[in-house]
């Protein structure tokens, strides 16, 4: 049987619909004699075998998502290999559905076993999407934020659709303040601040002490090289440590929306206005791909393999 002629437009349409690779889309259309719906099913049926082949490939793109349900919030990160897939509606719907379940699941291991609308588990659904989309996909991480009373603010930076983007933040404010709307507005503002300023901890005590000592040592050696007397060096080091804290400790950072005030001062003012104590119980900040080693040659190697095969 001679090979059926498949138009470039049909391949392009299938790629846009599924996010699968160009060669995979062309093969699917050839195998199904150009039937578009059957081609989609063909890609889906390849699931398990394709997932195994792609599992070793680096997935550092994708999306983070934030979801709040009352006094519970969750942030997740689902990775793909390319930004193209992150802009694919099928992938976005997958991430959104997983985030909705994550609020209930509470842990990533439990989440992977939860059933989706298709009847498949989250883990099985991801495997099927690997086949359809044509890239390695991974549910990399999730974190939960729960408070007994107060408000949770969320913010997603570089949104591609609501609540999905490159950076996702949750901030939980523990308080019995009666004006929940104002408390939620403050939590939202602090979430935006956290996205932009990337604090490492809420207060001094939350900082990794090994990191503090390393900074202290660097400041000490630098001051010593400047030939300062020991008593001056000590004061200079303490001054630099205070500056370091003001850069990485949330409560000591200058507030994004009122730069003349620290976050701690803004909270103190809000306490006076709302007539109740307010405490930052926890914040979560996920930035897409942080900590993942990017494989620069991955795509080039894949292209070479296609052209040589």
Curated annotation (Swiss-Prot):
Pfam families: EF_TS (PF00889). GO terms for molecular function: translation elongation factor activity. InterPro entries: EF-Ts_dimer_sf, Transl_elong_EFTs/EF1B, Transl_elong_EFTs/EF1B_dimer, Transl_elong_Ts_CS, UBA-like_sf. SUPFAM superfamilies: Elongation factor Ts (EF-Ts), dimerisation domain, UBA-like. Transmembrane segments: none annotated. One of its GO terms (cellular component) is cytoplasm. Its main location: cytoplasm. PANTHER family: ELONGATION FACTOR TS, ELONGATION FACTOR TS, MITOCHONDRIAL. Belongs to the EF-Ts family. This is Elongation factor Ts. The gene is tsf.
């Amino acid at each position: 049987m001679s090979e059926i002629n498949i138009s470039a437009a049909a391949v392009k349409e299938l790629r846009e619909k599924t996010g699968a690779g160009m060669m995979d889309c062309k093969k699917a259309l050839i195998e199904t004699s150009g039937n578009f719906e059957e081609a989609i099913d063909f890609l889906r049926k390849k699931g398990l075998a394709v997932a195994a082949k792609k599992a070793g490939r680096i997935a550092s793109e994708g999306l983070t998502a934030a979801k709040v349900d009352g006094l519970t919030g969750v942030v997740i990160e689902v990775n793909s290999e390319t930004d193209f897939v992150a802009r694919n509606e099928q992938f976005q719907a997958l991430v959104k559905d997983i985030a909705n379940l994550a609020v209930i699941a509470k842990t990533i291991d439990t989440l992977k076993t939860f059933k989706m609308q298709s009847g498949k588990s989250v883990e099985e659904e991801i495997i099927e999407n690997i086949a359809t989309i044509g890239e390695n996909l991974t549910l990399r991480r999730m974190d939960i934020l729960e408070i007994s009373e107060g408000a949770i603010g969320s913010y997603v930076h570089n949104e591609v659709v609501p609540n999905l983007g490159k950076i996702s933040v949750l901030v939980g404010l523990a308080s019995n303040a009666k004006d929940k709307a104002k408390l939620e507005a403050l939590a939202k503002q602090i979430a935006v601040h956290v996205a932009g300023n990337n604090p490492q901890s809420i207060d001094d005590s939350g900082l990794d002490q090994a990191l503090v000592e390393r900074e202290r040592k660097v400041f000490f050696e630098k001051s010593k090289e400047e030939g300062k007397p020991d008593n001056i060096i000590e004061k200079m080091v303490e001054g630099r440590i205070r500056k370091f804290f003001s850069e990485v400790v949330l409560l000591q950072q200058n507030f994004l929306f009122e730069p003349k005030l620290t976050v701690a001062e803004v909270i103190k003012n809000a306490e006076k206005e709302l007539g109740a104590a307010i405490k930052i119980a926890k914040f979560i900040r996920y930035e897409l791909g942080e900590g993942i080693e990017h494989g620069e040659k991955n795509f080039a190697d894949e292209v070479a393999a296609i052209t040589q095969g």
